[in-house]
A protein has these predicted regions:
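Active-site loop ensemble at the mouth of alpha/beta enzyme cores that anchors a bound cofactor
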Residues: 48-50, 83-161
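Gly/Ser/Thr-rich active-site loops/lids in small-molecule metabolic enzymes
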Residues: 53-58, 123, 163-167
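Short, structured beta-strand/loop micro-motifs enriched in basic residues and often containing a Trp
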Residues: 165-178
Protein backbone atom coordinates (compact mmCIF):
# COMPACT_ATOMS: atom_id res chain seq x y z
CA UNK A 1 0.00 0.00 0.00
CA UNK A 2 1.65 3.17 -1.16
CA UNK A 3 4.97 1.42 -1.85
CA UNK A 4 4.92 2.21 -5.56
CA UNK A 5 5.20 -1.44 -6.53
CA UNK A 6 2.31 -3.46 -7.94
CA UNK A 7 -1.27 -2.37 -8.30
CA UNK A 8 -2.60 1.15 -8.42
CA UNK A 9 -2.39 4.03 -6.00
CA UNK A 10 -4.85 4.09 -3.11
CA UNK A 11 -7.81 6.40 -3.65
CA UNK A 12 -9.61 7.18 -6.89
CA UNK A 13 -7.31 4.95 -9.01
CA UNK A 14 -8.11 1.93 -6.83
CA UNK A 15 -11.84 2.68 -6.98
CA UNK A 16 -11.69 3.08 -10.77
CA UNK A 17 -9.88 -0.25 -11.14
CA UNK A 18 -12.41 -1.99 -8.91
CA UNK A 19 -15.22 -0.57 -11.08
CA UNK A 20 -13.53 -1.89 -14.24
CA UNK A 21 -13.10 -5.33 -12.70
CA UNK A 22 -16.72 -5.42 -11.52
CA UNK A 23 -17.93 -4.40 -15.02
CA UNK A 24 -15.95 -7.14 -16.78
CA UNK A 25 -18.04 -10.28 -17.36
CA UNK A 26 -15.30 -12.86 -16.81
CA UNK A 27 -13.96 -11.13 -13.69
CA UNK A 28 -15.30 -10.78 -10.17
CA UNK A 29 -14.17 -8.07 -7.77
CA UNK A 30 -13.35 -9.92 -4.55
CA UNK A 31 -11.71 -7.17 -2.50
CA UNK A 32 -8.47 -5.36 -1.86
CA UNK A 33 -4.98 -6.74 -1.57
CA UNK A 34 -3.04 -4.40 0.72
CA UNK A 35 0.49 -5.54 1.44
CA UNK A 36 2.95 -3.12 3.01
CA UNK A 37 6.16 -4.92 2.11
CA UNK A 38 8.44 -2.06 3.05
CA UNK A 39 7.27 -2.28 6.66
CA UNK A 40 8.13 -5.96 7.15
CA UNK A 41 11.77 -5.42 8.01
CA UNK A 42 11.64 -2.11 9.82
CA UNK A 43 13.66 -2.94 12.92
CA UNK A 44 11.76 -1.08 15.63
CA UNK A 45 8.23 -2.11 16.68
CA UNK A 46 7.11 1.54 16.74
CA UNK A 47 8.29 2.05 13.15
CA UNK A 48 6.39 -1.03 11.95
CA UNK A 49 3.29 0.01 13.87
CA UNK A 50 3.33 3.53 12.39
CA UNK A 51 3.83 2.22 8.84
CA UNK A 52 0.92 -0.21 9.19
CA UNK A 53 -1.33 2.41 10.75
CA UNK A 54 -0.72 4.63 7.71
CA UNK A 55 -1.27 1.76 5.26
CA UNK A 56 -4.40 0.63 7.11
CA UNK A 57 -5.79 4.15 6.95
CA UNK A 58 -5.35 4.14 3.15
CA UNK A 59 -6.91 0.68 2.85
CA UNK A 60 -9.89 1.79 4.96
CA UNK A 61 -10.36 4.91 2.84
CA UNK A 62 -10.47 2.82 -0.36
CA UNK A 63 -12.79 0.23 1.18
CA UNK A 64 -15.11 2.98 2.47
CA UNK A 65 -15.08 4.73 -0.94
CA UNK A 66 -16.09 1.47 -2.64
CA UNK A 67 -18.92 0.91 -0.18
CA UNK A 68 -20.06 4.54 -0.61
CA UNK A 69 -20.39 3.84 -4.35
CA UNK A 70 -22.50 0.79 -3.65
CA UNK A 71 -19.76 -1.75 -4.34
CA UNK A 72 -19.25 -4.64 -1.98
CA UNK A 73 -15.70 -5.12 -0.75
CA UNK A 74 -15.92 -8.58 0.79
CA UNK A 75 -12.25 -8.93 1.63
CA UNK A 76 -9.26 -6.84 2.60
CA UNK A 77 -6.23 -9.09 2.54
CA UNK A 78 -2.55 -8.51 3.07
CA UNK A 79 -0.16 -8.29 6.01
CA UNK A 80 3.11 -10.11 6.44
CA UNK A 81 5.13 -11.98 9.02
CA UNK A 82 6.83 -8.84 10.31
CA UNK A 83 3.64 -6.86 10.85
CA UNK A 84 0.64 -9.18 10.95
CA UNK A 85 -0.20 -8.35 14.58
CA UNK A 86 -0.44 -4.67 13.61
CA UNK A 87 -2.75 -5.49 10.68
CA UNK A 88 -4.90 -7.65 12.96
CA UNK A 89 -5.16 -4.78 15.44
CA UNK A 90 -6.20 -2.35 12.69
CA UNK A 91 -9.67 -3.84 12.29
CA UNK A 92 -9.38 -3.44 8.50
CA UNK A 93 -7.95 -6.79 7.42
CA UNK A 94 -10.14 -9.85 6.96
CA UNK A 95 -7.28 -12.12 5.96
CA UNK A 96 -3.59 -12.25 6.80
CA UNK A 97 -0.99 -13.51 4.33
CA UNK A 98 1.98 -14.00 6.61
CA UNK A 99 4.13 -16.77 5.18
CA UNK A 100 7.74 -16.41 6.28
CA UNK A 101 6.90 -17.32 9.87
CA UNK A 102 6.85 -21.01 8.99
CA UNK A 103 10.62 -21.06 8.29
CA UNK A 104 11.78 -17.59 9.40
CA UNK A 105 14.57 -16.04 7.42
CA UNK A 106 17.64 -14.52 9.03
CA UNK A 107 16.61 -10.96 8.32
CA UNK A 108 13.38 -11.21 10.33
CA UNK A 109 15.42 -12.24 13.37
CA UNK A 110 16.93 -8.75 13.39
CA UNK A 111 13.53 -7.13 13.95
CA UNK A 112 13.13 -6.01 17.55
CA UNK A 113 9.99 -7.29 19.28
CA UNK A 114 7.71 -6.00 21.99
CA UNK A 115 7.59 -8.07 25.19
CA UNK A 116 4.29 -9.75 24.26
CA UNK A 117 4.99 -10.25 20.54
CA UNK A 118 5.07 -13.73 19.11
CA UNK A 119 8.61 -14.95 18.60
CA UNK A 120 9.04 -17.35 15.71
CA UNK A 121 12.12 -19.54 15.58
CA UNK A 122 14.14 -20.59 12.57
CA UNK A 123 12.91 -23.91 11.19
CA UNK A 124 14.78 -24.34 7.91
CA UNK A 125 18.52 -24.64 7.59
CA UNK A 126 21.04 -25.31 4.84
CA UNK A 127 23.73 -27.85 5.58
CA UNK A 128 27.11 -26.95 4.15
CA UNK A 129 30.50 -28.60 4.40
CA UNK A 130 33.88 -26.94 4.71
CA UNK A 131 35.72 -27.86 1.50
CA UNK A 132 38.98 -26.13 2.25
CA UNK A 133 40.75 -24.05 4.84
CA UNK A 134 43.13 -21.97 2.69
CA UNK A 135 44.08 -19.67 5.57
CA UNK A 136 43.72 -19.89 9.36
CA UNK A 137 40.85 -17.37 9.40
CA UNK A 138 39.09 -18.37 6.18
CA UNK A 139 37.10 -21.45 5.20
CA UNK A 140 35.42 -22.27 1.88
CA UNK A 141 32.01 -23.98 1.92
CA UNK A 142 30.30 -26.15 -0.67
CA UNK A 143 27.18 -23.94 -0.61
CA UNK A 144 26.71 -20.64 -2.39
CA UNK A 145 24.10 -18.60 -4.22
CA UNK A 146 22.41 -21.70 -5.62
CA UNK A 147 21.79 -22.88 -2.05
CA UNK A 148 20.81 -19.63 -0.32
CA UNK A 149 19.70 -16.13 -1.16
CA UNK A 150 21.47 -12.92 -0.21
CA UNK A 151 18.78 -10.38 -1.11
CA UNK A 152 18.44 -9.42 2.56
CA UNK A 153 22.07 -9.84 3.43
CA UNK A 154 24.34 -12.81 3.91
CA UNK A 155 23.09 -15.87 5.78
CA UNK A 156 24.22 -16.41 9.35
CA UNK A 157 25.81 -19.54 10.76
CA UNK A 158 23.39 -20.94 13.32
CA UNK A 159 24.53 -20.27 16.88
CA UNK A 160 28.07 -19.45 15.76
CA UNK A 161 28.64 -15.69 16.03
CA UNK A 162 32.38 -16.34 15.57
CA UNK A 163 31.74 -17.39 11.95
CA UNK A 164 30.65 -14.90 9.32
CA UNK A 165 29.78 -15.62 5.70
CA UNK A 166 31.49 -12.82 3.79
CA UNK A 167 31.36 -13.85 0.13
CA UNK A 168 29.34 -16.16 -2.07
CA UNK A 169 29.56 -17.39 -5.64
CA UNK A 170 27.18 -19.83 -7.33
CA UNK A 171 28.61 -22.93 -5.67
CA UNK A 172 30.79 -21.67 -2.82
CA UNK A 173 30.61 -19.55 0.29
CA UNK A 174 33.51 -18.01 2.19
CA UNK A 175 33.50 -17.99 5.98
CA UNK A 176 35.65 -15.64 8.00
CA UNK A 177 36.59 -17.13 11.36
CA UNK A 178 37.13 -14.64 14.17
CA UNK A 179 39.49 -15.23 17.08
Amino acid sequence: VGSNRCGVSPGKDAVALARLIAASAPLRFAGLHCYQGSAQHLRLPAERKTAIQEASKLAKEVRDALVAEGMACPRVTGAGTGTFLNECDSGIFDEVQAGSYIFMDRDYSENQLEANDLHFEHALFIQATVMSYPEPHRAVLDAGLKAFSVDSGMPAVWKRPDLKLTKASDEHGVLEVSD
